[in-house]
Protein backbone atom coordinates (compact mmCIF):
# COMPACT_ATOMS: atom_id res chain seq x y z
CA UNK A 1 0.00 0.00 0.00
CA UNK A 2 1.13 3.55 -0.70
CA UNK A 3 2.24 5.30 2.47
CA UNK A 4 1.40 8.82 1.22
CA UNK A 5 4.84 10.14 2.11
CA UNK A 6 5.02 13.55 3.74
CA UNK A 7 7.59 16.10 2.54
CA UNK A 8 10.07 15.35 5.30
CA UNK A 9 9.82 11.62 4.54
CA UNK A 10 10.97 11.89 0.91
CA UNK A 11 14.55 10.68 1.62
CA UNK A 12 13.00 7.60 3.26
CA UNK A 13 10.68 7.15 0.29
CA UNK A 14 13.60 6.93 -2.14
CA UNK A 15 15.17 4.10 -0.16
CA UNK A 16 11.90 2.24 0.28
CA UNK A 17 11.19 2.43 -3.45
CA UNK A 18 14.57 0.79 -4.09
CA UNK A 19 13.81 -1.89 -1.50
CA UNK A 20 10.43 -2.60 -3.09
CA UNK A 21 11.98 -2.88 -6.55
CA UNK A 22 14.50 -5.45 -5.31
CA UNK A 23 11.77 -7.37 -3.47
CA UNK A 24 9.73 -7.47 -6.69
CA UNK A 25 12.72 -9.07 -8.39
CA UNK A 26 12.80 -11.57 -5.52
CA UNK A 27 9.13 -12.41 -5.98
CA UNK A 28 9.80 -12.99 -9.66
CA UNK A 29 12.11 -15.82 -8.62
CA UNK A 30 15.38 -14.09 -9.43
CA UNK A 31 16.70 -13.65 -5.89
CA UNK A 32 20.34 -14.44 -5.27
CA UNK A 33 22.49 -14.06 -2.16
CA UNK A 34 23.99 -10.81 -3.38
CA UNK A 35 20.55 -9.29 -3.92
CA UNK A 36 19.37 -10.48 -0.52
CA UNK A 37 22.33 -8.79 1.16
CA UNK A 38 21.62 -5.56 -0.73
CA UNK A 39 17.99 -5.57 0.47
CA UNK A 40 19.15 -6.13 4.06
CA UNK A 41 21.63 -3.24 3.85
CA UNK A 42 19.03 -0.91 2.39
CA UNK A 43 16.55 -1.80 5.15
CA UNK A 44 19.16 -1.04 7.81
CA UNK A 45 19.96 2.25 6.10
CA UNK A 46 16.25 3.10 5.89
CA UNK A 47 15.74 2.38 9.61
CA UNK A 48 18.73 4.56 10.56
CA UNK A 49 17.41 7.36 8.38
CA UNK A 50 13.94 7.06 9.93
CA UNK A 51 15.43 7.21 13.43
CA UNK A 52 17.36 10.36 12.53
CA UNK A 53 14.45 12.14 10.82
CA UNK A 54 11.85 11.22 13.42
CA UNK A 55 14.11 12.23 16.32
CA UNK A 56 14.25 15.78 14.94
CA UNK A 57 10.60 16.43 14.08
CA UNK A 58 9.19 19.88 14.71
CA UNK A 59 5.66 20.66 15.91
CA UNK A 60 4.36 21.24 12.38
CA UNK A 61 5.73 17.92 11.16
CA UNK A 62 4.09 16.16 14.12
CA UNK A 63 0.83 17.91 13.22
CA UNK A 64 1.11 16.48 9.71
CA UNK A 65 1.67 12.98 11.12
CA UNK A 66 -1.33 13.34 13.46
CA UNK A 67 -3.48 13.96 10.37
CA UNK A 68 -1.87 11.34 8.15
CA UNK A 69 -4.60 9.83 5.93
CA UNK A 70 -3.39 6.30 6.70
CA UNK A 71 -3.08 6.80 10.45
CA UNK A 72 -5.11 4.19 12.39
CA UNK A 73 -8.53 5.43 13.49
CA UNK A 74 -10.76 4.42 16.39
CA UNK A 75 -12.26 1.43 14.58
CA UNK A 76 -8.78 0.13 13.73
CA UNK A 77 -7.91 0.07 17.44
CA UNK A 78 -11.24 -1.49 18.41
CA UNK A 79 -10.62 -4.34 15.97
CA UNK A 80 -7.12 -4.99 17.35
CA UNK A 81 -7.46 -4.31 21.08
CA UNK A 82 -10.99 -5.40 21.98
CA UNK A 83 -13.28 -8.33 21.23
CA UNK A 84 -17.07 -8.71 20.92
CA UNK A 85 -17.61 -5.06 20.03
CA UNK A 86 -21.32 -4.25 19.82
CA UNK A 87 -21.93 -0.79 18.37
CA UNK A 88 -24.74 1.43 19.69
CA UNK A 89 -26.39 4.21 17.68
CA UNK A 90 -28.39 7.35 18.31
CA UNK A 91 -28.74 9.92 21.07
CA UNK A 92 -32.45 9.10 21.73
CA UNK A 93 -33.23 12.76 21.04
CA UNK A 94 -32.46 13.72 17.44
CA UNK A 95 -30.33 11.36 15.34
CA UNK A 96 -27.31 9.12 15.09
CA UNK A 97 -23.97 10.82 14.40
CA UNK A 98 -21.49 8.54 12.59
CA UNK A 99 -18.62 10.84 13.64
CA UNK A 100 -18.88 9.22 17.09
CA UNK A 101 -18.38 5.47 17.27
CA UNK A 102 -19.29 3.71 20.49
CA UNK A 103 -20.44 0.51 22.10
CA UNK A 104 -19.73 -2.32 24.51
CA UNK A 105 -16.66 -4.52 24.03
CA UNK A 106 -14.35 -6.75 26.01
CA UNK A 107 -10.75 -6.03 26.96
CA UNK A 108 -9.25 -9.46 27.58
CA UNK A 109 -12.65 -10.65 28.75
CA UNK A 110 -13.60 -7.62 30.85
CA UNK A 111 -16.63 -5.61 29.68
CA UNK A 112 -15.79 -1.99 28.84
CA UNK A 113 -17.52 0.90 27.09
CA UNK A 114 -15.54 2.14 24.09
CA UNK A 115 -16.23 5.58 22.57
CA UNK A 116 -14.26 7.46 19.95
CA UNK A 117 -14.31 9.90 17.09
CA UNK A 118 -14.13 8.20 13.70
CA UNK A 119 -12.78 9.81 10.54
CA UNK A 120 -13.34 8.33 7.10
CA UNK A 121 -10.92 6.81 4.59
CA UNK A 122 -12.47 7.39 1.18
CA UNK A 123 -14.53 10.35 0.02
CA UNK A 124 -17.89 8.71 0.74
CA UNK A 125 -16.92 7.68 4.27
CA UNK A 126 -15.32 11.04 5.01
CA UNK A 127 -18.63 12.71 4.17
CA UNK A 128 -20.60 10.12 6.16
CA UNK A 129 -18.36 10.62 9.20
CA UNK A 130 -18.30 14.41 8.67
CA UNK A 131 -14.48 14.25 8.61
CA UNK A 132 -14.48 13.25 12.29
CA UNK A 133 -16.25 16.43 13.44
CA UNK A 134 -19.11 15.44 15.78
CA UNK A 135 -22.43 17.27 15.97
CA UNK A 136 -24.40 17.71 19.23
CA UNK A 137 -26.18 14.40 18.69
CA UNK A 138 -22.78 12.70 18.57
CA UNK A 139 -21.75 14.08 21.94
CA UNK A 140 -25.17 13.25 23.37
CA UNK A 141 -24.77 9.69 22.09
CA UNK A 142 -21.39 9.55 23.84
CA UNK A 143 -23.00 10.86 27.03
CA UNK A 144 -25.75 8.23 26.82
CA UNK A 145 -23.14 5.49 26.55
CA UNK A 146 -21.07 6.88 29.41
CA UNK A 147 -24.11 7.02 31.69
CA UNK A 148 -24.98 3.47 30.66
CA UNK A 149 -21.43 2.38 31.53
CA UNK A 150 -21.74 4.02 34.93
CA UNK A 151 -25.07 2.29 35.54
CA UNK A 152 -23.59 -1.12 34.75
CA UNK A 153 -20.23 -0.36 36.40
CA UNK A 154 -18.18 -0.71 33.22
CA UNK A 155 -14.88 1.16 32.72
CA UNK A 156 -14.93 3.73 29.91
CA UNK A 157 -12.22 4.08 27.28
CA UNK A 158 -12.34 6.96 24.81
CA UNK A 159 -10.32 7.56 21.66
CA UNK A 160 -9.88 11.19 20.62
CA UNK A 161 -9.26 12.07 16.98
CA UNK A 162 -11.00 15.18 15.67
CA UNK A 163 -10.12 18.54 14.13
CA UNK A 164 -12.89 19.91 16.36
CA UNK A 165 -16.63 19.89 16.96
CA UNK A 166 -18.67 20.64 13.84
CA UNK A 167 -19.28 24.43 13.64
CA UNK A 168 -22.26 24.36 11.24
CA UNK A 169 -25.44 26.38 11.73
CA UNK A 170 -27.54 23.28 12.42
CA UNK A 171 -25.11 22.07 15.07
CA UNK A 172 -25.22 25.45 16.81
CA UNK A 173 -29.02 25.53 16.65
CA UNK A 174 -29.16 22.11 18.31
CA UNK A 175 -26.89 23.22 21.16
CA UNK A 176 -23.32 22.27 20.31
CA UNK A 177 -21.78 24.21 23.20
CA UNK A 178 -24.35 22.87 25.67
CA UNK A 179 -23.68 19.29 24.59
CA UNK A 180 -19.93 19.73 25.06
CA UNK A 181 -20.34 21.47 28.42
CA UNK A 182 -22.69 18.78 29.73
CA UNK A 183 -20.21 16.06 28.78
CA UNK A 184 -17.44 17.86 30.64
CA UNK A 185 -19.62 18.15 33.73
CA UNK A 186 -20.77 14.53 33.72
CA UNK A 187 -17.36 13.03 32.91
CA UNK A 188 -15.79 14.87 35.84
CA UNK A 189 -17.97 12.92 38.27
CA UNK A 190 -18.46 9.50 36.62
CA UNK A 191 -18.18 6.73 39.19
CA UNK A 192 -16.28 4.34 36.94
CA UNK A 193 -12.66 4.36 35.72
CA UNK A 194 -12.33 6.57 32.64
CA UNK A 195 -9.28 6.40 30.37
CA UNK A 196 -8.91 8.80 27.43
CA UNK A 197 -6.36 8.56 24.63
CA UNK A 198 -5.56 11.09 21.91
CA UNK A 199 -4.77 8.92 18.87
CA UNK A 200 -4.51 11.67 16.23
CA UNK A 201 -5.82 15.21 16.38
CA UNK A 202 -7.07 16.56 19.69
CA UNK A 203 -8.98 19.58 18.45
CA UNK A 204 -10.24 21.98 21.12
CA UNK A 205 -13.62 21.47 22.84
CA UNK A 206 -14.50 18.80 20.33
CA UNK A 207 -11.74 16.69 21.84
CA UNK A 208 -12.40 17.69 25.45
CA UNK A 209 -16.02 16.54 25.18
CA UNK A 210 -14.83 12.93 25.43
CA UNK A 211 -11.48 13.74 27.04
CA UNK A 212 -12.11 14.21 30.77
CA UNK A 213 -10.82 11.16 32.58
CA UNK A 214 -8.79 9.60 35.36
CA UNK A 215 -5.98 8.96 32.90
CA UNK A 216 -5.35 10.90 29.70
CA UNK A 217 -2.76 9.53 27.28
CA UNK A 218 -1.42 10.74 23.95
CA UNK A 219 0.22 8.77 21.19
CA UNK A 220 3.74 9.95 20.41
CA UNK A 221 2.81 11.78 17.20
CA UNK A 222 -0.63 13.04 18.18
CA UNK A 223 -1.52 16.67 18.92
CA UNK A 224 -3.74 18.55 21.38
CA UNK A 225 -4.60 22.22 20.98
CA UNK A 226 -7.31 24.87 21.32
CA UNK A 227 -7.18 25.64 17.59
CA UNK A 228 -5.48 24.25 14.51
CA UNK A 229 -2.09 25.73 13.56
CA UNK A 230 -3.68 27.08 10.36
CA UNK A 231 -6.50 28.71 12.34
CA UNK A 232 -4.08 30.29 14.79
CA UNK A 233 -1.87 31.56 11.96
CA UNK A 234 -4.87 33.07 10.17
CA UNK A 235 -5.83 35.00 13.31
CA UNK A 236 -2.37 36.15 14.43
CA UNK A 237 -0.54 36.56 11.12
CA UNK A 238 -3.50 36.80 8.71
CA UNK A 239 -2.03 33.93 6.71
CA UNK A 240 -2.35 30.14 7.01
CA UNK A 241 1.16 29.93 5.54
CA UNK A 242 2.45 30.71 9.04
CA UNK A 243 1.01 27.43 10.36
CA UNK A 244 4.48 25.92 11.11
CA UNK A 245 5.31 28.96 13.25
CA UNK A 246 1.95 28.74 15.01
CA UNK A 247 2.38 25.03 15.73
CA UNK A 248 5.70 25.69 17.47
CA UNK A 249 4.29 28.63 19.44
CA UNK A 250 1.21 26.73 20.64
CA UNK A 251 3.10 23.65 21.85
CA UNK A 252 0.68 21.17 20.26
CA UNK A 253 2.84 18.04 20.48
CA UNK A 254 2.36 15.20 22.95
CA UNK A 255 5.84 15.81 24.34
CA UNK A 256 5.08 19.46 25.10
CA UNK A 257 1.63 18.71 26.54
CA UNK A 258 3.24 16.13 28.84
CA UNK A 259 5.87 18.66 29.93
CA UNK A 260 3.00 20.95 30.96
CA UNK A 261 1.58 18.05 33.02
CA UNK A 262 -1.75 18.18 31.17
CA UNK A 263 -1.70 14.47 30.34
CA UNK A 264 -0.54 11.38 32.18
CA UNK A 265 1.40 9.31 29.65
CA UNK A 266 2.94 9.21 26.19
CA UNK A 267 2.49 6.01 24.19
CA UNK A 268 5.37 5.22 21.85
CA UNK A 269 4.61 4.70 18.18
CA UNK A 270 6.39 2.26 15.84
CA UNK A 271 9.40 3.67 14.00
CA UNK A 272 8.06 6.02 11.33
CA UNK A 273 4.65 6.50 12.94
CA UNK A 274 1.52 4.51 13.75
CA UNK A 275 0.45 4.35 10.09
CA UNK A 276 3.41 2.09 9.30
CA UNK A 277 2.38 -0.71 11.64
CA UNK A 278 -1.19 -0.83 12.97
CA UNK A 279 -0.67 -4.06 14.90
CA UNK A 280 2.44 -2.86 16.75
CA UNK A 281 0.74 0.42 17.63
CA UNK A 282 -2.33 -1.39 18.93
CA UNK A 283 -0.15 -3.68 21.07
CA UNK A 284 1.62 -0.68 22.63
CA UNK A 285 -1.67 1.05 23.36
CA UNK A 286 -3.28 -2.09 24.79
CA UNK A 287 -0.43 -2.45 27.28
CA UNK A 288 -0.97 1.15 28.39
CA UNK A 289 -4.75 0.78 28.70
CA UNK A 290 -4.49 -2.42 30.74
CA UNK A 291 -1.91 -0.87 33.04
CA UNK A 292 -4.03 2.23 33.60
CA UNK A 293 -7.15 0.17 34.21
CA UNK A 294 -5.38 -2.05 36.75
CA UNK A 295 -4.08 1.01 38.59
CA UNK A 296 -7.54 2.59 38.76
CA UNK A 297 -9.28 -0.62 39.80
CA UNK A 298 -6.85 -0.92 42.71
CA UNK A 299 -8.27 2.32 44.14
CA UNK A 300 -11.44 2.74 46.14
CA UNK A 301 -14.18 4.85 44.52
CA UNK A 302 -13.42 7.71 46.89
CA UNK A 303 -9.70 7.60 46.10
CA UNK A 304 -10.34 7.51 42.37
CA UNK A 305 -12.72 10.47 42.43
CA UNK A 306 -10.39 12.42 44.72
CA UNK A 307 -7.44 11.87 42.39
CA UNK A 308 -9.53 12.91 39.39
CA UNK A 309 -10.73 16.06 41.16
CA UNK A 310 -7.20 17.06 42.19
CA UNK A 311 -5.91 16.45 38.68
CA UNK A 312 -8.60 18.61 37.09
CA UNK A 313 -8.22 21.39 39.63
CA UNK A 314 -4.45 21.52 39.09
CA UNK A 315 -4.86 22.76 35.51
CA UNK A 316 -3.83 26.38 35.07
CA UNK A 317 -2.40 26.61 38.58
CA UNK A 318 0.66 28.82 38.93
CA UNK A 319 2.80 28.91 42.06
Curated annotation (Swiss-Prot):
Chief place where the protein resides: cytoplasm
Pathway: Lipid metabolism; malonyl-CoA biosynthesis; malonyl-CoA from acetyl-CoA: step 1/1
Enzyme Commission number(s): 2.1.3.15
Catalytic reaction annotation: N(6)-carboxybiotinyl-L-lysyl-[protein] + acetyl-CoA = N(6)-biotinyl-L-lysyl-[protein] + malonyl-CoA
Annotated Gene Ontology cellular component terms: acetyl-CoA carboxylase complex
Domain of life: Bacteria
InterPro entries, alphabetized: Acetyl_CoA_COase_a_su, ClpP/crotonase-like_dom_sf, COA_CT_C
Location of this chain's protein in the cell: Cytoplasm
A molecular function (GO) term: ATP binding
Assigned keywords, A-Z: ATP-binding, Cytoplasm, Fatty acid biosynthesis, Fatty acid metabolism, Lipid biosynthesis, Lipid metabolism, Nucleotide-binding, Transferase
All copies of domain CoA carboxyltransferase C-terminal, residue ranges: 34-295
Oligomeric and partner information: Acetyl-CoA carboxylase is a heterohexamer composed of biotin carboxyl carrier protein (AccB), biotin carboxylase (AccC) and two subunits each of ACCase subunit alpha (AccA) and ACCase subunit beta (AccD).
Family named by the database record: Belongs to the AccA family.
NCBIfam families, sorted: accA, AccA_sub, PRK05724.1
Function recorded in the entry: Component of the acetyl coenzyme A carboxylase (ACC) complex. First, biotin carboxylase catalyzes the carboxylation of biotin on its carrier protein (BCCP) and then the CO(2) group is transferred by the carboxyltransferase to acetyl-CoA to form malonyl-CoA.
Name assigned to this protein: Acetyl-coenzyme A carboxylase carboxyl transferase subunit alpha
Organism: Pseudoalteromonas translucida (strain TAC 125)
Gene that this polypeptide is encoded by: accA
Amino acid sequence: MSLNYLDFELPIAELEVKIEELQNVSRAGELDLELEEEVSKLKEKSDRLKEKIFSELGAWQVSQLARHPLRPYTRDYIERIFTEFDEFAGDRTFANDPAILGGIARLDGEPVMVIGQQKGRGTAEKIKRNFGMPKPEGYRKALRLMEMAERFKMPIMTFIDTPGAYPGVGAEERGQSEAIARNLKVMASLKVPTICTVIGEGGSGGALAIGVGDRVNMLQYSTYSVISPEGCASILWKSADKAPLAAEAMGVTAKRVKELDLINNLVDEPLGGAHRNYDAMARNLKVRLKRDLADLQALSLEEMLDQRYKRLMSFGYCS
